[in-house]
Amino acid sequence: MLKYFGTDGVRGVANAGLTPEMAFKLGRDGGYVLTKDKKDGERAKVLVSRDTRISGQMLEYALISGLLSVGIEVLEVGVITTPGLSYLVRAQGADAGVQISASHNPVEDNGIKFFGSDGLKLSDAKEEEIEKLIDAPEDKLPRPSAEGLGTVTNYHEGASKYLQFIENTLPEELSGIKVVVDGANGAASALISRLFADMGVDFTTIATHPDGLNINDHVGATHTKKLQEEVVKQGAQLGLAFDGDADRCIAVDENGNEVDGDHIMYVIGSYLADHGRLKKDTIVTTVMSNLGFTKALERRGLKNIRTQVGDRYVSEEMRANGYNLGGEQSGHVIISDYHNTGDGMLTGLHLLYVMKDTGKSLSELLSDFKEYPQRLINVPVENKKDWKEHKRITEAIEKVEKELSDEGRIFVRPSGTQSLLRVMTEAPTQELADKYCEEVAKVVEEEMGSN
Protein backbone atom coordinates (compact mmCIF):
# COMPACT_ATOMS: atom_id res chain seq x y z
CA MET A 1 0.00 0.00 0.00
CA LEU A 2 1.42 3.36 -1.05
CA LYS A 3 1.77 6.15 1.49
CA TYR A 4 0.82 9.22 -0.55
CA PHE A 5 -0.69 7.97 -3.81
CA GLY A 6 -4.25 6.68 -3.92
CA THR A 7 -6.23 5.40 -6.89
CA ASP A 8 -6.28 8.91 -8.38
CA GLY A 9 -2.96 10.47 -7.50
CA VAL A 10 -2.17 12.36 -4.30
CA ARG A 11 -5.15 14.00 -2.62
CA GLY A 12 -5.89 15.90 0.55
CA VAL A 13 -7.35 19.06 2.01
CA ALA A 14 -5.62 21.91 0.18
CA ASN A 15 -3.10 23.84 2.30
CA ALA A 16 -3.47 21.27 5.10
CA GLY A 17 -2.96 17.67 3.96
CA LEU A 18 -1.87 18.78 0.50
CA THR A 19 0.39 21.79 1.03
CA PRO A 20 2.40 23.94 -1.39
CA GLU A 21 5.52 22.36 0.12
CA MET A 22 4.20 18.92 -0.82
CA ALA A 23 3.29 20.13 -4.29
CA PHE A 24 6.85 21.41 -4.75
CA LYS A 25 8.28 18.02 -3.73
CA LEU A 26 5.89 16.19 -6.03
CA GLY A 27 6.92 18.45 -8.90
CA ARG A 28 10.61 18.01 -8.18
CA ASP A 29 10.63 14.30 -7.37
CA GLY A 30 7.87 13.27 -9.78
CA GLY A 31 9.33 15.32 -12.57
CA TYR A 32 12.73 13.72 -12.05
CA VAL A 33 11.37 10.15 -12.05
CA LEU A 34 9.37 10.71 -15.23
CA THR A 35 12.12 12.45 -17.21
CA LYS A 36 15.40 11.04 -15.88
CA ASP A 37 15.92 8.83 -18.94
CA LYS A 38 16.19 11.76 -21.35
CA LYS A 39 19.44 11.84 -23.30
CA ASP A 40 22.04 14.40 -22.30
CA GLY A 41 21.23 17.75 -23.83
CA GLU A 42 17.55 16.91 -24.41
CA ARG A 43 15.06 19.00 -22.50
CA ALA A 44 12.18 17.19 -20.84
CA LYS A 45 8.72 18.66 -21.48
CA VAL A 46 5.82 18.41 -19.01
CA LEU A 47 2.27 19.77 -19.36
CA VAL A 48 0.55 21.16 -16.25
CA SER A 49 -3.16 21.96 -15.90
CA ARG A 50 -5.87 22.30 -13.25
CA ASP A 51 -9.58 22.48 -12.55
CA THR A 52 -11.43 25.53 -11.18
CA ARG A 53 -10.77 25.18 -7.42
CA ILE A 54 -9.55 28.26 -5.59
CA SER A 55 -6.52 26.28 -4.36
CA GLY A 56 -5.52 25.27 -7.88
CA GLN A 57 -3.17 28.14 -8.65
CA MET A 58 -1.46 27.92 -5.26
CA LEU A 59 -0.60 24.28 -5.86
CA GLU A 60 0.11 24.82 -9.55
CA TYR A 61 2.78 27.45 -8.93
CA ALA A 62 4.43 25.31 -6.26
CA LEU A 63 4.38 22.22 -8.46
CA ILE A 64 5.78 24.12 -11.44
CA SER A 65 8.60 25.47 -9.24
CA GLY A 66 9.53 21.90 -8.40
CA LEU A 67 9.55 20.90 -12.05
CA LEU A 68 11.66 23.91 -13.03
CA SER A 69 14.17 23.13 -10.29
CA VAL A 70 15.18 19.90 -12.04
CA GLY A 71 15.46 21.56 -15.45
CA ILE A 72 12.09 20.65 -16.96
CA GLU A 73 10.35 22.75 -19.61
CA VAL A 74 6.75 23.34 -18.51
CA LEU A 75 3.80 23.96 -20.81
CA GLU A 76 1.14 25.67 -18.67
CA VAL A 77 -2.23 24.63 -20.09
CA GLY A 78 -4.46 26.45 -17.60
CA VAL A 79 -7.94 25.13 -16.79
CA ILE A 80 -8.82 22.02 -18.77
CA THR A 81 -10.40 18.63 -18.12
CA THR A 82 -8.28 15.69 -16.98
CA PRO A 83 -8.93 13.73 -20.21
CA GLY A 84 -8.07 16.91 -22.09
CA LEU A 85 -4.65 16.96 -20.47
CA SER A 86 -4.18 13.24 -21.14
CA TYR A 87 -4.87 13.80 -24.84
CA LEU A 88 -2.57 16.82 -25.08
CA VAL A 89 0.35 14.96 -23.48
CA ARG A 90 0.22 12.46 -26.34
CA ALA A 91 -0.58 15.02 -29.02
CA GLN A 92 2.35 17.24 -28.00
CA GLY A 93 4.80 14.37 -27.58
CA ALA A 94 5.40 15.48 -23.99
CA ASP A 95 7.30 13.39 -21.46
CA ALA A 96 4.57 13.68 -18.83
CA GLY A 97 1.55 15.64 -17.66
CA VAL A 98 0.26 16.73 -14.27
CA GLN A 99 -3.36 17.60 -13.50
CA ILE A 100 -4.24 19.49 -10.32
CA SER A 101 -7.75 18.38 -9.42
CA ALA A 102 -9.74 16.43 -6.86
CA SER A 103 -12.34 15.40 -9.44
CA HIS A 104 -15.75 15.03 -7.78
CA ASN A 105 -14.52 15.86 -4.25
CA PRO A 106 -15.63 19.05 -2.45
CA VAL A 107 -13.82 22.36 -2.97
CA GLU A 108 -11.73 22.01 0.22
CA ASP A 109 -9.89 19.07 -1.34
CA ASN A 110 -7.42 19.06 -4.18
CA GLY A 111 -5.15 16.54 -5.80
CA ILE A 112 -2.10 16.06 -8.00
CA LYS A 113 -2.29 13.39 -10.69
CA PHE A 114 0.60 12.38 -12.95
CA PHE A 115 0.40 11.00 -16.48
CA GLY A 116 3.18 9.33 -18.42
CA SER A 117 4.14 10.13 -22.01
CA ASP A 118 1.38 7.75 -23.17
CA GLY A 119 -1.25 9.89 -21.44
CA LEU A 120 -1.97 7.13 -18.93
CA LYS A 121 -1.87 7.16 -15.14
CA LEU A 122 1.37 5.95 -13.60
CA SER A 123 2.04 2.38 -12.57
CA ASP A 124 2.29 1.48 -8.89
CA ALA A 125 6.04 1.01 -9.40
CA LYS A 126 6.50 4.57 -10.70
CA GLU A 127 4.44 6.01 -7.86
CA GLU A 128 6.47 4.03 -5.35
CA GLU A 129 9.68 5.40 -6.88
CA ILE A 130 8.38 8.95 -6.42
CA GLU A 131 7.37 8.25 -2.82
CA LYS A 132 10.85 6.97 -1.97
CA LEU A 133 12.35 10.27 -3.13
CA ILE A 134 9.78 12.27 -1.16
CA ASP A 135 10.67 10.40 2.04
CA ALA A 136 14.43 10.30 1.41
CA PRO A 137 16.41 11.81 4.33
CA GLU A 138 18.39 13.96 1.90
CA ASP A 139 17.52 15.52 -1.46
CA LYS A 140 20.25 14.37 -3.85
CA LEU A 141 18.51 15.30 -7.10
CA PRO A 142 20.22 17.63 -9.60
CA ARG A 143 20.09 21.37 -8.88
CA PRO A 144 20.94 23.08 -12.17
CA SER A 145 21.53 26.81 -12.34
CA ALA A 146 21.33 29.49 -15.02
CA GLU A 147 20.69 27.87 -18.41
CA GLY A 148 20.08 24.49 -16.77
CA LEU A 149 16.84 25.63 -15.14
CA GLY A 150 13.47 24.97 -16.73
CA THR A 151 11.16 27.62 -18.17
CA VAL A 152 7.38 28.04 -18.43
CA THR A 153 5.47 28.52 -21.69
CA ASN A 154 1.78 29.41 -21.92
CA TYR A 155 -0.15 26.71 -23.80
CA HIS A 156 -3.77 27.81 -23.34
CA GLU A 157 -4.47 27.05 -27.01
CA GLY A 158 -4.34 23.38 -26.02
CA ALA A 159 -8.05 23.53 -25.17
CA SER A 160 -9.00 24.24 -28.79
CA LYS A 161 -6.84 21.37 -29.99
CA TYR A 162 -8.57 19.02 -27.55
CA LEU A 163 -12.07 20.11 -28.60
CA GLN A 164 -11.18 19.56 -32.26
CA PHE A 165 -10.07 16.03 -31.36
CA ILE A 166 -13.45 15.23 -29.76
CA GLU A 167 -15.39 16.69 -32.69
CA ASN A 168 -13.43 14.53 -35.13
CA THR A 169 -14.55 11.30 -33.39
CA LEU A 170 -18.12 11.79 -34.64
CA PRO A 171 -19.25 11.43 -38.27
CA GLU A 172 -21.91 14.15 -38.23
CA GLU A 173 -23.45 16.97 -36.25
CA LEU A 174 -25.87 16.14 -33.45
CA SER A 175 -28.88 18.38 -34.05
CA GLY A 176 -32.45 17.36 -33.33
CA ILE A 177 -32.22 16.30 -29.68
CA LYS A 178 -32.69 18.75 -26.83
CA VAL A 179 -30.03 18.39 -24.12
CA VAL A 180 -29.36 19.98 -20.72
CA VAL A 181 -25.68 19.93 -19.69
CA ASP A 182 -24.37 20.28 -16.11
CA GLY A 183 -20.74 21.42 -15.97
CA ALA A 184 -20.37 21.06 -12.16
CA ASN A 185 -18.80 24.55 -12.18
CA GLY A 186 -15.65 22.64 -13.00
CA ALA A 187 -13.02 22.23 -15.68
CA ALA A 188 -15.51 21.61 -18.49
CA SER A 189 -17.46 24.82 -17.81
CA ALA A 190 -15.69 26.97 -20.41
CA LEU A 191 -15.53 24.13 -22.96
CA ILE A 192 -19.11 22.87 -23.03
CA SER A 193 -20.69 25.72 -24.98
CA ARG A 194 -17.91 25.72 -27.58
CA LEU A 195 -18.04 21.96 -28.11
CA PHE A 196 -21.80 21.48 -28.13
CA ALA A 197 -22.37 24.52 -30.36
CA ASP A 198 -19.77 23.27 -32.84
CA MET A 199 -21.59 19.90 -32.95
CA GLY A 200 -24.94 21.54 -33.65
CA VAL A 201 -26.54 20.36 -30.41
CA ASP A 202 -29.73 22.03 -29.16
CA PHE A 203 -28.59 22.57 -25.58
CA THR A 204 -28.84 24.64 -22.43
CA THR A 205 -26.41 24.60 -19.51
CA ILE A 206 -26.41 24.73 -15.73
CA ALA A 207 -23.45 25.06 -13.36
CA THR A 208 -21.03 26.54 -15.90
CA HIS A 209 -20.01 29.66 -13.96
CA PRO A 210 -17.17 28.66 -11.62
CA ASP A 211 -16.08 31.13 -8.95
CA GLY A 212 -13.37 28.98 -7.34
CA LEU A 213 -15.66 27.87 -4.54
CA ASN A 214 -18.74 26.35 -6.21
CA ILE A 215 -17.17 23.34 -7.95
CA ASN A 216 -19.31 20.21 -7.36
CA ASP A 217 -21.52 22.20 -4.96
CA HIS A 218 -24.77 20.23 -5.21
CA VAL A 219 -24.25 19.94 -8.96
CA GLY A 220 -22.37 17.66 -11.32
CA ALA A 221 -22.11 13.91 -11.75
CA THR A 222 -22.47 13.13 -8.04
CA HIS A 223 -25.39 15.54 -7.46
CA THR A 224 -27.83 15.17 -10.35
CA LYS A 225 -31.07 16.35 -8.68
CA LYS A 226 -30.96 19.83 -10.21
CA LEU A 227 -30.20 18.40 -13.66
CA GLN A 228 -33.05 15.90 -13.36
CA GLU A 229 -35.44 18.73 -12.52
CA GLU A 230 -34.21 20.85 -15.45
CA VAL A 231 -34.58 18.01 -17.97
CA VAL A 232 -38.22 17.51 -16.99
CA LYS A 233 -38.92 21.25 -16.74
CA GLN A 234 -37.47 21.98 -20.19
CA GLY A 235 -38.91 18.89 -21.86
CA ALA A 236 -35.41 17.79 -22.88
CA GLN A 237 -34.64 14.29 -24.18
CA LEU A 238 -31.29 14.02 -22.40
CA GLY A 239 -29.30 15.43 -19.52
CA LEU A 240 -25.52 15.11 -19.19
CA ALA A 241 -23.63 15.78 -15.96
CA PHE A 242 -19.86 15.97 -15.64
CA ASP A 243 -17.79 16.09 -12.46
CA GLY A 244 -15.16 18.66 -11.48
CA ASP A 245 -12.52 17.47 -13.93
CA ALA A 246 -14.97 15.94 -16.45
CA ASP A 247 -13.44 12.49 -16.57
CA ARG A 248 -16.86 11.04 -15.84
CA CYS A 249 -20.35 11.45 -17.25
CA ILE A 250 -23.72 10.63 -15.72
CA ALA A 251 -26.85 10.96 -17.86
CA VAL A 252 -30.52 11.70 -17.22
CA ASP A 253 -33.25 10.25 -19.46
CA GLU A 254 -36.28 12.10 -20.82
CA ASN A 255 -38.31 11.14 -17.74
CA GLY A 256 -35.78 12.64 -15.32
CA ASN A 257 -34.27 9.30 -14.25
CA GLU A 258 -30.54 9.13 -13.51
CA VAL A 259 -28.56 6.92 -15.89
CA ASP A 260 -25.21 5.79 -14.47
CA GLY A 261 -22.05 4.45 -16.08
CA ASP A 262 -23.33 0.87 -16.27
CA HIS A 263 -26.35 2.00 -18.29
CA ILE A 264 -24.27 4.28 -20.52
CA MET A 265 -21.84 1.45 -21.30
CA TYR A 266 -24.76 -0.87 -22.04
CA VAL A 267 -26.23 1.58 -24.57
CA ILE A 268 -22.93 2.38 -26.30
CA GLY A 269 -21.74 -1.25 -26.12
CA SER A 270 -24.99 -2.59 -27.60
CA TYR A 271 -24.75 -0.08 -30.44
CA LEU A 272 -21.13 -1.01 -31.15
CA ALA A 273 -22.02 -4.73 -31.06
CA ASP A 274 -24.94 -4.22 -33.47
CA HIS A 275 -22.48 -2.62 -35.90
CA GLY A 276 -19.75 -5.26 -35.42
CA ARG A 277 -17.47 -2.82 -33.61
CA LEU A 278 -17.43 -4.13 -30.01
CA LYS A 279 -14.15 -6.00 -29.81
CA LYS A 280 -14.50 -9.58 -28.54
CA ASP A 281 -18.14 -8.79 -27.71
CA THR A 282 -16.92 -7.74 -24.27
CA ILE A 283 -17.24 -4.74 -21.95
CA VAL A 284 -14.74 -4.34 -19.11
CA THR A 285 -16.02 -2.97 -15.79
CA THR A 286 -15.05 -3.05 -12.14
CA VAL A 287 -16.50 -5.26 -9.41
CA MET A 288 -18.83 -2.37 -8.51
CA SER A 289 -20.95 -2.78 -11.65
CA ASN A 290 -24.50 -3.96 -11.06
CA LEU A 291 -25.40 -7.63 -11.52
CA GLY A 292 -28.20 -6.48 -13.77
CA PHE A 293 -25.59 -5.08 -16.17
CA THR A 294 -23.95 -8.49 -16.61
CA LYS A 295 -27.28 -10.26 -17.05
CA ALA A 296 -28.48 -7.69 -19.62
CA LEU A 297 -25.29 -8.22 -21.63
CA GLU A 298 -25.68 -12.00 -21.44
CA ARG A 299 -29.18 -11.74 -22.92
CA ARG A 300 -27.57 -10.01 -25.91
CA GLY A 301 -24.82 -12.63 -26.18
CA LEU A 302 -22.21 -10.21 -24.83
CA LYS A 303 -19.66 -10.66 -22.06
CA ASN A 304 -18.55 -8.68 -19.01
CA ILE A 305 -15.06 -8.87 -17.52
CA ARG A 306 -14.54 -7.27 -14.09
CA THR A 307 -11.45 -5.74 -12.50
CA GLN A 308 -10.68 -4.24 -9.12
CA VAL A 309 -12.02 -0.74 -8.47
CA GLY A 310 -10.32 2.08 -10.36
CA ASP A 311 -10.52 3.15 -14.00
CA ARG A 312 -6.77 2.57 -14.22
CA TYR A 313 -7.32 -1.17 -13.78
CA VAL A 314 -10.10 -1.16 -16.37
CA SER A 315 -7.74 0.59 -18.78
CA GLU A 316 -4.96 -1.92 -18.09
CA GLU A 317 -7.28 -4.87 -18.77
CA MET A 318 -8.53 -3.30 -21.99
CA ARG A 319 -5.03 -2.65 -23.29
CA ALA A 320 -3.69 -6.04 -22.24
CA ASN A 321 -6.43 -8.02 -23.99
CA GLY A 322 -7.61 -5.83 -26.84
CA TYR A 323 -11.02 -4.61 -25.63
CA ASN A 324 -12.36 -1.24 -26.77
CA LEU A 325 -15.07 -0.37 -24.24
CA GLY A 326 -14.97 -0.31 -20.46
CA GLY A 327 -15.48 1.82 -17.41
CA GLU A 328 -17.07 2.25 -14.03
CA GLN A 329 -20.58 2.58 -12.68
CA SER A 330 -19.53 6.02 -11.41
CA GLY A 331 -19.39 7.31 -14.98
CA HIS A 332 -15.79 6.81 -16.08
CA VAL A 333 -16.24 5.37 -19.57
CA ILE A 334 -13.29 4.53 -21.83
CA ILE A 335 -13.97 4.29 -25.56
CA SER A 336 -10.46 3.28 -26.57
CA ASP A 337 -11.04 3.55 -30.31
CA TYR A 338 -10.71 7.28 -29.63
CA HIS A 339 -9.16 7.90 -26.21
CA ASN A 340 -7.23 5.83 -23.68
CA THR A 341 -8.84 7.32 -20.59
CA GLY A 342 -12.33 8.10 -19.29
CA ASP A 343 -13.65 11.27 -20.94
CA GLY A 344 -16.99 12.70 -19.83
CA MET A 345 -17.60 15.01 -22.78
CA LEU A 346 -16.57 12.38 -25.34
CA THR A 347 -18.84 9.82 -23.67
CA GLY A 348 -21.78 12.21 -23.51
CA LEU A 349 -21.59 13.10 -27.18
CA HIS A 350 -21.31 9.44 -28.24
CA LEU A 351 -24.35 8.58 -26.12
CA LEU A 352 -26.18 11.42 -27.88
CA TYR A 353 -25.03 10.06 -31.25
CA VAL A 354 -26.47 6.61 -30.49
CA MET A 355 -29.82 8.21 -29.65
CA LYS A 356 -29.82 10.21 -32.88
CA ASP A 357 -28.70 7.34 -35.12
CA THR A 358 -31.20 4.83 -33.70
CA GLY A 359 -34.04 7.31 -33.35
CA LYS A 360 -34.75 5.93 -29.89
CA SER A 361 -35.09 7.66 -26.54
CA LEU A 362 -32.66 6.78 -23.77
CA SER A 363 -35.36 4.92 -21.83
CA GLU A 364 -36.14 2.83 -24.93
CA LEU A 365 -32.47 1.97 -25.39
CA LEU A 366 -32.41 0.75 -21.78
CA SER A 367 -35.69 -1.18 -21.79
CA ASP A 368 -33.94 -4.57 -21.44
CA PHE A 369 -31.69 -3.46 -18.57
CA LYS A 370 -33.20 -4.62 -15.27
CA GLU A 371 -31.08 -3.29 -12.44
CA TYR A 372 -30.64 -5.18 -9.18
CA PRO A 373 -31.53 -2.99 -6.20
CA GLN A 374 -28.30 -1.66 -4.71
CA ARG A 375 -27.25 0.13 -1.53
CA LEU A 376 -23.94 1.84 -0.82
CA ILE A 377 -22.92 3.20 2.59
CA ASN A 378 -19.67 5.12 3.08
CA VAL A 379 -18.42 4.66 6.64
CA PRO A 380 -15.82 7.20 7.92
CA VAL A 381 -13.02 5.20 9.57
CA GLU A 382 -9.76 5.88 11.39
CA ASN A 383 -7.62 3.43 9.40
CA LYS A 384 -9.12 2.07 6.19
CA LYS A 385 -6.22 -0.26 5.44
CA ASP A 386 -6.61 -2.93 8.14
CA TRP A 387 -10.34 -3.69 7.98
CA LYS A 388 -9.79 -7.36 7.09
CA GLU A 389 -8.09 -7.87 10.45
CA HIS A 390 -11.38 -7.23 12.26
CA LYS A 391 -13.02 -10.63 12.77
CA ARG A 392 -16.49 -9.19 13.44
CA ILE A 393 -16.45 -7.45 10.06
CA THR A 394 -15.35 -10.51 8.09
CA GLU A 395 -17.89 -12.70 9.88
CA ALA A 396 -20.69 -10.24 9.11
CA ILE A 397 -19.71 -10.28 5.43
CA GLU A 398 -19.59 -14.08 5.31
CA LYS A 399 -23.07 -14.27 6.86
CA VAL A 400 -24.53 -12.00 4.18
CA GLU A 401 -22.74 -13.86 1.37
CA LYS A 402 -24.19 -17.15 2.57
CA GLU A 403 -27.73 -15.79 2.78
CA LEU A 404 -27.63 -14.06 -0.62
CA SER A 405 -25.93 -16.95 -2.45
CA ASP A 406 -25.99 -16.21 -6.22
CA GLU A 407 -29.01 -13.92 -5.97
CA GLY A 408 -26.98 -10.92 -4.84
CA ARG A 409 -23.65 -9.90 -3.39
CA ILE A 410 -21.85 -7.77 -0.83
CA PHE A 411 -18.66 -5.88 -1.51
CA VAL A 412 -16.49 -4.00 1.00
CA ARG A 413 -13.49 -1.90 0.01
CA PRO A 414 -11.52 1.13 1.21
CA SER A 415 -11.92 4.37 -0.72
CA GLY A 416 -8.89 5.17 -2.83
CA THR A 417 -9.07 8.88 -2.06
CA GLN A 418 -10.83 9.39 1.30
CA SER A 419 -10.79 7.91 4.84
CA LEU A 420 -13.84 5.79 4.14
CA LEU A 421 -14.78 2.13 3.99
CA ARG A 422 -17.40 1.55 1.31
CA VAL A 423 -20.03 -1.14 1.94
CA MET A 424 -22.13 -2.09 -1.09
CA THR A 425 -24.89 -4.69 -1.42
CA GLU A 426 -27.09 -5.94 -4.25
CA ALA A 427 -30.15 -8.12 -3.70
CA PRO A 428 -33.44 -9.16 -5.35
CA THR A 429 -35.30 -6.42 -3.44
CA GLN A 430 -34.36 -2.96 -2.16
CA GLU A 431 -35.49 -4.01 1.30
CA LEU A 432 -32.95 -6.84 1.40
CA ALA A 433 -30.17 -4.69 -0.08
CA ASP A 434 -30.79 -2.04 2.59
CA LYS A 435 -30.99 -4.60 5.39
CA TYR A 436 -27.73 -6.35 4.58
CA CYS A 437 -25.82 -3.14 3.84
CA GLU A 438 -26.93 -1.49 7.08
CA GLU A 439 -26.06 -4.60 9.09
CA VAL A 440 -22.48 -4.72 7.84
CA ALA A 441 -22.00 -0.93 7.90
CA LYS A 442 -23.08 -0.90 11.54
CA VAL A 443 -20.43 -3.49 12.42
CA VAL A 444 -17.78 -1.52 10.50
CA GLU A 445 -18.73 1.67 12.35
CA GLU A 446 -18.61 -0.08 15.73
CA GLU A 447 -15.22 -1.64 14.99
CA MET A 448 -13.45 1.14 13.08
CA GLY A 449 -15.62 4.29 13.00
CA SER A 450 -13.90 7.66 13.27
CA ASN A 451 -16.81 9.33 15.06
Curated annotation (Swiss-Prot):
Q: Which domain of life is it from?
A: Bacteria
E.C. number: 5.4.2.10
The record lists the catalysed reaction(s) as: alpha-D-glucosamine 1-phosphate = D-glucosamine 6-phosphate
| Gene Ontology MF: a single term | phosphomannomutase activity
The protein's matches in Gene3D superfamilies, at most eight in alphabetical order, are given as: Alpha-D-Glucose-1,6-Bisphosphate, subunit A, domain 3, Alpha-D-phosphohexomutase, C-terminal domain
Q: Where is the active site?
A: S103 (phosphoserine intermediate)
Sorted alphabetically, which SUPFAM superfamilies does this protein's record hold? Phosphoglucomutase, C-terminal domain, Phosphoglucomutase, first 3 domains
Question: How does the cofactor bind to this protein, according to its record?
Answer: Binds 1 Mg(2+) ion per subunit.
Q: How is it modified after translation?
A: Activated by phosphorylation.
Q: Which family does it belong to?
A: Belongs to the phosphohexose mutase family.
Can you say what this protein is called? Answer: Phosphoglucosamine mutase
Gene designation: glmM
